[in-house]
């Protein structure tokens, strides 16, 4: 809406669009408890944050909002929900058992222990933007094999519960950093899922976007929603019944898909942007908002 990627500000035109289409809300739900979050920020030596909005705001526990979104859009009645991200208020990993809509927390990791914060710190150490370009780190992890001595340095930091929220001071090649980060993440991820005793698993949180590590989930009937990160949590705040999983929740642009025109443009070695129908909801959206090009020209 603002044409700024990951804009932290809610754009005025988005609010107006919602009001024009659905009316003014009685209250607004937000996917973090700011009282608890500011307690954690104070503990970490950070300044508190506030939200200013013209409507009354009700707060929801962050990891519960993740879990609710994943469960209610899944095909399961009874299942385990695993939430792994950088950080919520205090939780960085939670595991829930859900029986017919009743959520029971089984385990949790709390700040500063966080495999998500570790991965973000490694993203920053490699020269990419933390909390945004972790997908680049994941892709880069396959480029180069790391040296075992450098792996041991980072692994020791993880084993000694280093607080990665402040970053990590290493000077390895960025592709080696990526390789080390992915290997340690996958080692810890396998330990986590090996302790799950269930056939049905819902996996949510920002770490659910690490599609390379998700190959270890084939032992379960696994459901990962289209937007497992904080965007999905906005739905998780308010949802309380099963709805069909559907990624087409964004702004609608009418018109037919211009297949013939796209083909002609590609034949002329052009790059083509296509916007048609409702935009997909989630960071891995592809289809109704796409760029096309002939990769043989690269």
Model region roles, listed by residue range:
Residues 1-298:
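Short acidic/glycine-rich loops and adjacent helix/strand connectors
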């Amino acid at each position: 809406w603002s044409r700024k990627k990951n804009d932290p500000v809610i754009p005025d035109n988005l609010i107006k669009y919602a009001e024009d289409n659905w009316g003014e809300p009685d209250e607004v739900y937000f996917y973090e408890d700011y009282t608890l979050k500011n307690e954690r920020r104070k503990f970490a030596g950070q300044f508190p944050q506030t939200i200013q909005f013209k409507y009354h705001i009700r707060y929801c526990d962050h990891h519960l909002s993740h879990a609710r979104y994943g469960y209610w859009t899944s095909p399961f009645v009874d299942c385990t929900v695993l939430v792994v991200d950088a950080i919520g208020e205090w939780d960085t990993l939670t595991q829930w058992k859900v029986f017919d809509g009743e959520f029971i927390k089984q385990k949790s990791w709390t700040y500063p222990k966080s495999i998500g914060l570790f991965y973000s710190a490694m993203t920053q150490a490699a020269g990419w933007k933390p909390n945004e370009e972790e997908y680049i780190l994941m892709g880069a992890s396959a480029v180069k094999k790391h040296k075992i001595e450098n792996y041991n340095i980072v692994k020791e930091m993880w084993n000694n519960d280093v607080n990665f929220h402040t970053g990590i001071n290493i000077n390895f090649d960025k592709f080696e950093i990526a390789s080390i980060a992915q290997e340690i993440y996958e080692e810890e991820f396998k330990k986590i899922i090996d302790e799950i005793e269930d056939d049905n698993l819902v996996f949510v949180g920002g770490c659910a976007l690490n599609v390379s590590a998700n190959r270890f989930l084939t032992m379960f009937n696994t459901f990962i929603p289209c937007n497992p990160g904080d965007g999905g949590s906005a739905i998780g705040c308010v949802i309380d019944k099963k709805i069909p999983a559907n990624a087409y929740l964004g702004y609608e642009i009418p018109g037919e898909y211009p297949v013939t025109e796209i083909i002609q443009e590609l034949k002329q070695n052009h790059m083509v942007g296509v916007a048609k129908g409702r935009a997909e909801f989630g960071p891995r959206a592809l289809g109704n908002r796409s760029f096309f090009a002939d990769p043989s020209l690269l």
